[in-house]
């Protein structure tokens, strides 16, 4: 990739520079049209610009034109948009003077017009002057076949023009605010408009007779809360017709580019990477083959197999942050990020048809040129195959063919007349027969042939003989009503309820319809009706009657799936909160409980004995899973926890004074409302990283950060959220691995050498190796250390607290705890415990050393 910033490629007059608002490339890749604040449209020569990419000293070449080919100044205000027609014949320009001009290149040399530059090489004349808008015109777009043109502006109007006569076809005022962008579907079925009312409206148009338009869908979800400070909302449609890139979208508090899928019109993907609102997105007009990362050198018929059949599309996005990002549909991260590529906001972008050059305009009056090497984005598929990807949406090749001259249209009419002359005029006579004869309809011929084949008389040899034959016997199919099965009577089963009344027991309807048997009966009756002239209808056998009667009279239904012969093995586990008798007597408020339905296996004495021995637990309605997650984390067994204070901003440091890294955590909401999705959507957690006093990254998280720690050995930040998730990021903000969900609140994070130790609220320990990014220890319980004394009663008291944790050289976990004896005024004692990875249990450090020494002695002996 090369970046060109030429001093003469800008809108400049004398000593003053003007903002450039728009640019567009002609279909033949020979001209670049730009417009800006000076109210002039400038046409540049692209081949002359590209000579500077190959030769930096090309300014000394006299053959290179370092000025515009033409400069047009017919607008009375700033030029906000210019667009070449797809056939390259016209150039449309819109301005804040509310006038839409249609330009056409004039062949030959003519006298310069008033107001035009006398040194212009090309001369563009205004063919039509369209007046219909009541305010600034913001964007213009042509249909792929140049049949219609759509213009939008600040007057909320969407005006559709005829592409050949430039008459106004229709006007829509469906938006509630300024309309700042419009784009056409490459399959020529839709066009989309973007407005400051935070919506995108999809219009469907049909070219059946008079063109009709209708609003297909309204997209609002990606643009909730989007800022209204952007001057443009320039959309772009992918060349395969599958996606729309819409700038100035929002993902929480972050400005993004929304990728909208065709058909569903949903936005499952957002391009996140811009600090300020985006104003323009532009798809590369070429489709590229997807290159595998692990491409092999194997060949099949002399061709490499490293390239798959899947394709990629390239999209560029930019806006007020002066940053250009180039994305690929197959990668989650941008291919290219060029920061501060311009001095001010970027207003427009345009690709050449071959997809190798990108032009960028900015408010700093510069026009930036980016040139890409061959196969830098991948191997581009031929342009003819682009149409094949659009065929699934109904596009045809005829809609993409443009008549170049009047002679071409005359030749096409002559070709149509030639085809009509070659049509066989005797086709109707051949079908109906010669005059004077009556031909039998084709359907009767087929029936007569079939009847002849069944009777064995052979085929007819002449059409005249069929008229003398007997009229064919046609079977008439009559609709038969569903008859009840003979021998089966509807039996109602009466039951007696508790109060002595009789009720009809319900019959399961699963066997009321047997798909297999009903289908067989329908097929059998149809076959019998078709062959009623050959053989009489047979009655069902007595065995079938008895089977049907049994199936309909049964009260049991077949299961929807097969069950094993011995049943399904189940295991029920849980807490016994109350005895059955107490639950029936106390828990039920219904006085009409049927005691006969309660199966009590134990006797009264056994129940009294159980209730006296065990402590009955009562379920507290406030102790729910939601309340556990919402409450503040419990740190009763930690002497020092690492939970962040519930403040606006919290700082964490790692490293030395000479090499200091700082992490700033700004939780968007308080922990009391951490599960309020709407509040988190509006105020996400913001994490800032600093190194040597300079900001190195900025990240947004959809959760509240509970604790964090840094590891200087691996230069990694570890963040834990209130939802039990861990994030591992480096000092540049890149994720070292996908987020890890533990399912428990992490109340302490500490590092030891290149390991990170996580202690959860449920007294479990996890250890990760940050060098290999692997899990070293998992689900190590602390309860054997915290509750070493036998528990008496129904309550457990923890008298020990964890003071510190670290990893040894043998990758064993060592804990230092303080123990306070109950009802004692003595100083707390310090205890040391070691979790041996080889023994998978807790032990004292001395015992572990003895075990290691004995093992070494056995090995040496």
From Swiss-Prot:
InterPro entries: CAF1B_HIR1_beta-prop, HIR1-like, HIRA-like_C, HIRA_B_motif, WD40/YVTN_repeat-like_dom_sf, WD40_repeat_CS, WD40_repeat_dom_sf, WD40_rpt. This is Protein HIR1. Keywords: Chromatin regulator, Nucleus, Repeat, Repressor, Transcription, Transcription regulation, WD repeat. It comes from Kluyveromyces lactis (strain ATCC 8585 / CBS 2359 / DSM 70799 / NBRC 1267 / NRRL Y-1140 / WM37) (Yeast). SMART domains: WD40. CDD domains: WD40 (cd00200). The gene is HIR1. One of its GO terms (molecular function) is nucleosome binding. The lineage of its organism: Eukaryota, Fungi, Dikarya, Ascomycota, Saccharomycotina. GO terms for biological process: chromatin remodeling; DNA-templated transcription; regulation of DNA-templated transcription. Belongs to the WD repeat HIR1 family. One of its GO terms (cellular component) is nucleus. Required for replication-independent chromatin assembly and for the periodic repression of histone gene transcription during the cell cycle. Residues 450-471 are annotated as: Disordered. It comes from the Eukaryota. Residues 455-466 have a biased composition (Low complexity). Its main location: nucleus. It is found in: Nucleus.
